[in-house]
């Protein structure tokens, strides 16, 4: 795995960050994380030549690695109120979003229901020498209560409605970035002020569904 990381990928990451900046991503920390993350190790080798295109790609198990713009946009939204000390990620998937988050906070807690994806993501994070990520094989709808509350929560698949457990695990003053919906999905920001949750709609998006229940 580590042999797949080299100078060429560093340059490719920098070019991708420049492209995302031209499309409106402005947070320096997010752009730096994108530039320093070898996206090609998070996709199947047969698709590595497309890794630095601004497009979603299949990673197996009916899942995808999100479009880099969406990864950057959601990360930027998480940081809008400052640097969170901890982040809960629902849907580890390829681990690419996880790798970006790990460069933006002290600790990432990531939940994935498909064990094979979790194993692969762990290998990629080790290859990047990122060690501030804890992973759980679990139902994303339930979050990770024992590790909360969380300054920020990001959901990388779309539930039909906002899971109540995630609202409960959001710290006072924290923010949740989540795509919601079935056929039509909207990216939302939910901020917590005591027992009050304020919701803001960002833009239309397209994600795989956040499946509750059985683990794979």
Curated annotation (Swiss-Prot):
Record's catalysed reaction(s): [protein]-L-isoaspartate + S-adenosyl-L-methionine = [protein]-L-isoaspartate alpha-methyl ester + S-adenosyl-L-homocysteine
Key word S-adenosyl-L-methionine present: yes
Keywords for this protein: Cytoplasm, Methyltransferase, S-adenosyl-L-methionine, Transferase
Residue positions of the active site: 66
Transmembrane residue ranges: none
A Gene Ontology molecular function term of the record: protein-L-isoaspartate (D-aspartate) O-methyltransferase activity
Keyword set includes Nucleotide-binding: no
Intracellular or extracellular location(s): Cytoplasm
UniProt cross-references to CDD domains, sorted A to Z: AdoMet_MTases
Gene3D superfamilies: Vaccinia Virus protein VP39 (3.40.50.150)
Family to which the UniProt record says this protein belongs: Belongs to the methyltransferase superfamily. L-isoaspartyl/D-aspartyl protein methyltransferase family.
Protein name: Protein-L-isoaspartate O-methyltransferase
Originating organism: Colwellia psychrerythraea (strain 34H / ATCC BAA-681) (Vibrio psychroerythus)
């Amino acid at each position: 795995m580590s042999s797949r990381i080299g100078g060429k990928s560093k340059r490719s990451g920098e070019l991708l960050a420049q492209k995302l900046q031209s499309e409106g991503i402005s947070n320096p920390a997010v752009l730096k994380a994108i530039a320093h993350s070898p996206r090609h190790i998070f996709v199947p080798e047969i698709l590595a030549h497309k890794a630095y295109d601004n497009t979603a790609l299949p990673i197996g198990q009916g899942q995808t690695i999100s479009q880099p713009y969406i990864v950057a946009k959601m990360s930027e939204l998480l940081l809008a109120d400052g640097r969170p000390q901890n982040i809960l990620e629902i849907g580890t998937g390829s681990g690419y979003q996880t790798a970006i988050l790990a460069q933006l906070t002290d600790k990432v807690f990531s939940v994935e229901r498909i064990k094979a994806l979790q194993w692969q993501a762990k290998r990629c994070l080790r290859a990047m020498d990122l060690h501030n990520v804890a992973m759980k094989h679990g139902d994303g709808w339930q979050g990770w209560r024992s590790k909360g509350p969380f300054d920020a929560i990001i959901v990388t698949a779309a539930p039909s409605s906002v899971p109540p457990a995630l609202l409960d695990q959001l710290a006072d003053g924290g923010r949740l970035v989540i795509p919601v919906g079935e056929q039509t999905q909207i990216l939302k920001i939910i901020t917590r002020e005591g027992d009050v949750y304020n919701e803001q709609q960002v833009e239309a998006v397209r994600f795989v569904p956040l499946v509750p229940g059985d683990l794979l």
